[in-house]
């Protein structure tokens, strides 16, 4: 009762959890910049959910997890490994999810700035999807994490566009819960003054129509940019399986009895409009023939990659009709052993410069 009264007594400035429907995102620059190409025939884009630099530590919301926070050495060690991968892969544009900006669990390290200062990328944009001055549960404390876009070229403007919330949650829970969004960043390419990168991270569970509503809004943002004559590449963790998936539930990395197991039954066609209206980095025919080559997530490294959650789309054209696009799962496929860097694998897509 005391806790409830305390919560009621606090107004939204105490926790500062809310966002406008649209608002400017936070812009970044690397401390020391590297020279960016003035011309190019193609752009290498990588989409990557980096799990807030948590690597394969098991947190309390994961299977058999007990951890709440990381030591400085753990966070910087994990981020340094990710930065090494980014430097070696050398993307022109990097689209990230689950990036901490100022969170107790990662020792308040601004991960967007940290990665900019340790890679060949020069500019960044960040938007929060969970910003709470003090989260009074499970030792979380201060939380600020979200999505980020990093680029070799300047980002002149960036916008956070709110996505629909989970309406079924009680008011107090919804108030402190994640506020998902679409992040758009206008990148000033020397040869193109109307190019955008777009980033999103959708609801992990369907929760009624929430995930479907978020997919619809994401599609609408992309459609509007195309109608305005903008060129774009969009990516994110959509927490959805594509049509042609061999398995929709009973994954080897599930934790029955601990958490609700993942079940995507009935959602198979939810992301069809994205595939129908835009160019996907993943060819659905190839995916249907070999699901495993496009797996990009697993909750347990020892079980191997178990499903496809991460995607890249464009209204442009992929180099070689997308033949060089891939999920960078391993040394054999992508050149890097990424399964220990995060619970998601990076997705590579190569965009033709027209």
Where do the PLM segments sit?
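Bacterial N-terminal signal peptides
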Residues: 1-7
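N-terminal, active-site-proximal structural segment of metallo-dependent hydrolase catalytic domains
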Residues: 8-144, 354
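Metal-dependent phosphoester-hydrolase catalytic domains
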Residues: 11-33, 209, 222-233, 240-354
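Beta-strand-turn-beta hairpins that frame and shape the catalytic cleft
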Residues: 35-45, 143-157, 171-199, 351-354
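Active-site beta-strand/loop signature of hydrolases that rely on acidic residues for catalysis
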Residues: 43-50, 81-108, 150, 185, ...
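Surface-exposed cleft-lining segments at the edges of enzyme active sites
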Residues: 66-71, 99-101, 165-174, 201-209
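Short helix-loop capping/hinge motifs at secondary-structure junctions, enriched
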Residues: 120, 154-159, 318-321
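Conserved S-adenosyl-L-methionine
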Residues: 123-131, 158-164, 323-329
């Amino acid at each position: 009762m005391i806790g409830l009264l305390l919560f009621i007594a606090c107004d939204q400035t105490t926790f500062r959890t809310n966002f406008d429907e649209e608002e400017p995102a936070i812009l970044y620059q690397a401390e020391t910049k590297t020279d960016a190409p003035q011309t190019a025939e193609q752009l290498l884009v990588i989409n990557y959910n980096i799990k807030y630099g948590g690597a394969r530590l098991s947190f309390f919301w994961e299977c058999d997890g007990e951890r709440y926070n990381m030591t400085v050495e753990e966070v910087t060690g994990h981020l340094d490994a990710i930065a090494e991968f980014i430097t070696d892969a050398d993307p022109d544009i990097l689209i990230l999810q689950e990036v901490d900006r100022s969170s107790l669990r990662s020792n308040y390290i601004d991960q967007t700035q940290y990665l900019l200062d340790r890679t060949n990328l020069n500019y960044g944009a960040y938007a929060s999807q969970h910003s709470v001055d003090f989260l009074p549960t499970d030792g979380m404390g201060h939380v600020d994490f979200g999505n980020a876009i990093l680029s070799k070229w300047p980002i002149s403007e960036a916008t956070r566009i709110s996505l629909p919330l989970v309406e079924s949650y009680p008011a107090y829970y919804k108030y402190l819960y994640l506020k998902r969004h679409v992040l758009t960043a206008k990148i000033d390419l020397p040869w193109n003054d109307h190019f955008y990168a777009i980033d999103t991270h959708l609801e992990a569970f369907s929760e009624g129509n929430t995930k479907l509503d978020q997919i619809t809004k994401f599609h609408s943002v992309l459609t509007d940019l195309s109608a305005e004559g903008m060129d774009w590449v969009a990516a994110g963790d959509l927490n959805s399986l594509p049509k042609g998936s061999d398995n929709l539930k009973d994954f080897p990395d599930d934790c029955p009895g601990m958490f609700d197991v993942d079940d995507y039954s009935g959602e198979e066609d939810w992301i069809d409009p994205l595939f129908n209206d835009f160019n996907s980095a993943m060819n659905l025919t190839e995916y249907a023939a070999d699901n495993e080559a496009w797996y990009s997530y697993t909750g347990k490294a020892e079980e191997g990659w178990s499903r496809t959650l991460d995607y890249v789309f464009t209204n442009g054209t992929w180099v070689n009709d997308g033949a060089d696009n891939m999920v960078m799962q391993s040394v054999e496929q992508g050149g890097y052993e990424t399964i220990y860097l995060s619970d998601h694998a990076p997705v590579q897509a190569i965009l033709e410069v027209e």
